[in-house]
Amino acid sequence: DIAYVKNTVGFYRRELDAVLARKKRAKSSSGTVIPGFVPDPAKTFNRGFTDFGLKGPTAGWSSPGTPKSLGERIGTVAKAAKDYFTLTGPHDLANGDGICFFDARGELRGSVVNSVANDRVYPDKTGGLTAGAVIYRNHDRAFLKTLTAKTSCERRIAVSFVLSGT
Protein backbone atom coordinates (compact mmCIF):
# COMPACT_ATOMS: atom_id res chain seq x y z
CA ASP A 1 0.00 0.00 0.00
CA ILE A 2 1.81 3.11 -1.27
CA ALA A 3 -0.03 5.46 1.12
CA TYR A 4 1.05 3.40 4.14
CA VAL A 5 4.67 3.29 2.96
CA LYS A 6 4.84 7.04 2.20
CA ASN A 7 3.25 7.95 5.51
CA THR A 8 5.34 5.59 7.63
CA VAL A 9 8.66 6.37 5.93
CA GLY A 10 7.85 10.10 6.06
CA PHE A 11 7.16 9.86 9.78
CA TYR A 12 10.36 7.99 10.62
CA ARG A 13 12.44 10.20 8.30
CA ARG A 14 11.18 13.25 10.20
CA GLU A 15 11.92 11.62 13.57
CA LEU A 16 15.41 10.48 12.51
CA ASP A 17 16.24 13.92 11.11
CA ALA A 18 15.22 15.49 14.44
CA VAL A 19 17.47 13.08 16.39
CA LEU A 20 20.39 13.72 14.02
CA ALA A 21 19.95 17.49 14.33
CA ARG A 22 19.93 17.34 18.16
CA LYS A 23 23.09 15.26 18.22
CA LYS A 24 24.76 17.40 15.54
CA ARG A 25 25.20 14.44 13.23
CA ALA A 26 24.45 13.90 9.55
CA LYS A 27 22.84 11.11 7.57
CA SER A 28 25.00 9.15 5.16
CA SER A 29 22.81 9.87 2.13
CA SER A 30 22.60 13.17 0.30
CA GLY A 31 19.53 15.19 -0.42
CA THR A 32 16.46 16.27 1.45
CA VAL A 33 13.00 14.77 1.27
CA ILE A 34 10.12 17.24 1.41
CA PRO A 35 6.78 15.54 1.97
CA GLY A 36 3.73 17.41 0.75
CA PHE A 37 1.86 16.26 3.86
CA VAL A 38 2.31 15.98 7.62
CA PRO A 39 3.07 12.30 8.36
CA ASP A 40 0.69 10.72 10.87
CA PRO A 41 0.93 6.95 11.51
CA ALA A 42 -2.57 6.86 13.02
CA LYS A 43 -4.06 7.79 9.62
CA THR A 44 -2.88 4.72 7.70
CA PHE A 45 -2.94 1.06 8.69
CA ASN A 46 -2.38 1.02 12.43
CA ARG A 47 -3.05 -1.51 15.17
CA GLY A 48 -1.94 0.79 17.96
CA PHE A 49 1.41 1.59 19.51
CA THR A 50 3.59 -0.01 22.14
CA ASP A 51 6.97 0.56 23.75
CA PHE A 52 7.23 -3.23 24.04
CA GLY A 53 10.28 -4.19 26.06
CA LEU A 54 11.90 -0.74 26.05
CA LYS A 55 11.27 -0.26 29.77
CA GLY A 56 11.57 -3.87 30.91
CA PRO A 57 9.06 -6.73 30.67
CA THR A 58 5.75 -5.72 29.11
CA ALA A 59 2.31 -7.16 29.77
CA GLY A 60 -0.80 -6.44 27.74
CA TRP A 61 0.89 -5.41 24.49
CA SER A 62 -1.65 -7.03 22.17
CA SER A 63 -4.84 -5.59 20.65
CA PRO A 64 -7.44 -7.97 22.07
CA GLY A 65 -10.43 -6.09 20.60
CA THR A 66 -9.58 -6.74 16.96
CA PRO A 67 -6.65 -7.60 14.70
CA LYS A 68 -7.87 -4.92 12.28
CA SER A 69 -6.74 -1.32 12.00
CA LEU A 70 -8.85 1.01 14.15
CA GLY A 71 -7.28 4.17 12.77
CA GLU A 72 -7.30 7.47 14.60
CA ARG A 73 -9.60 8.19 17.54
CA ILE A 74 -12.10 10.87 16.51
CA GLY A 75 -14.39 11.19 19.51
CA THR A 76 -17.23 9.85 21.62
CA VAL A 77 -20.82 9.57 20.42
CA ALA A 78 -23.09 12.05 22.21
CA LYS A 79 -26.29 11.00 20.43
CA ALA A 80 -27.06 8.05 18.17
CA ALA A 81 -30.21 8.39 16.05
CA LYS A 82 -31.64 6.11 13.35
CA ASP A 83 -29.69 7.68 10.47
CA TYR A 84 -27.07 9.94 12.10
CA PHE A 85 -24.96 10.51 15.18
CA THR A 86 -23.31 13.46 16.91
CA LEU A 87 -20.01 13.59 18.76
CA THR A 88 -19.21 15.23 22.10
CA GLY A 89 -16.56 17.53 20.61
CA PRO A 90 -15.33 19.00 17.35
CA HIS A 91 -14.25 16.71 14.51
CA ASP A 92 -13.23 16.84 10.87
CA LEU A 93 -15.09 13.80 9.53
CA ALA A 94 -16.05 14.19 5.88
CA ASN A 95 -17.92 12.43 3.09
CA GLY A 96 -16.14 9.20 2.13
CA ASP A 97 -14.29 8.68 5.41
CA GLY A 98 -14.34 5.16 6.82
CA ILE A 99 -15.26 4.88 10.49
CA CYS A 100 -15.49 2.09 13.01
CA PHE A 101 -16.54 1.53 16.62
CA PHE A 102 -17.07 -1.27 19.11
CA ASP A 103 -20.72 -2.10 19.76
CA ALA A 104 -22.18 -3.02 23.18
CA ARG A 105 -21.02 -6.65 22.72
CA GLY A 106 -17.45 -5.54 21.98
CA GLU A 107 -17.65 -6.39 18.28
CA LEU A 108 -16.02 -4.07 15.79
CA ARG A 109 -18.47 -2.45 13.38
CA GLY A 110 -17.67 -0.25 10.42
CA SER A 111 -19.36 2.25 8.15
CA VAL A 112 -18.66 4.96 5.60
CA VAL A 113 -19.61 8.60 6.15
CA ASN A 114 -22.18 9.62 3.53
CA SER A 115 -22.40 13.24 4.62
CA VAL A 116 -21.80 15.68 7.46
CA ALA A 117 -24.22 18.53 8.15
CA ASN A 118 -23.54 20.90 11.04
CA ASP A 119 -22.78 18.59 13.96
CA ARG A 120 -24.56 15.55 12.49
CA VAL A 121 -22.66 12.70 10.85
CA TYR A 122 -24.71 10.55 8.45
CA PRO A 123 -23.04 7.16 7.92
CA ASP A 124 -24.30 4.45 5.57
CA LYS A 125 -24.95 2.17 8.58
CA THR A 126 -25.72 3.01 12.21
CA GLY A 127 -26.55 -0.47 13.52
CA GLY A 128 -25.13 -1.10 16.98
CA LEU A 129 -24.08 2.52 17.50
CA THR A 130 -24.97 3.93 20.92
CA ALA A 131 -24.17 7.04 22.93
CA GLY A 132 -20.79 6.65 24.60
CA ALA A 133 -19.24 4.61 21.78
CA VAL A 134 -15.81 5.76 20.63
CA ILE A 135 -15.56 6.54 16.90
CA TYR A 136 -12.33 5.84 15.01
CA ARG A 137 -11.53 6.93 11.46
CA ASN A 138 -9.82 4.06 9.65
CA HIS A 139 -9.98 5.65 6.18
CA ASP A 140 -9.22 9.37 5.90
CA ARG A 141 -10.22 10.12 2.33
CA ALA A 142 -8.64 13.59 2.12
CA PHE A 143 -5.35 12.46 3.70
CA LEU A 144 -5.09 9.44 1.41
CA LYS A 145 -5.82 11.61 -1.63
CA THR A 146 -2.90 13.85 -0.62
CA LEU A 147 -0.62 10.83 -0.14
CA THR A 148 -1.42 9.30 -3.51
CA ALA A 149 -1.00 12.54 -5.48
CA LYS A 150 2.05 12.60 -7.76
CA THR A 151 3.29 15.73 -6.00
CA SER A 152 2.95 14.30 -2.48
CA CYS A 153 6.69 13.97 -1.97
CA GLU A 154 9.80 15.60 -3.38
CA ARG A 155 13.50 14.83 -3.03
CA ARG A 156 16.03 17.59 -3.55
CA ILE A 157 19.75 17.02 -3.98
CA ALA A 158 22.09 19.99 -3.80
CA VAL A 159 24.40 20.38 -6.78
CA SER A 160 27.51 22.51 -7.01
CA PHE A 161 29.24 23.10 -10.35
CA VAL A 162 31.47 25.55 -12.15
CA LEU A 163 30.88 26.78 -15.70
CA SER A 164 33.76 28.04 -17.75
CA GLY A 165 34.26 29.02 -21.37
CA THR A 166 36.54 27.08 -23.69
Where are these regions (language model features)?
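Surface-exposed amphipathic alpha-helical tracts and adjacent flexible/coil segments at the periphery
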Residues: 1-166
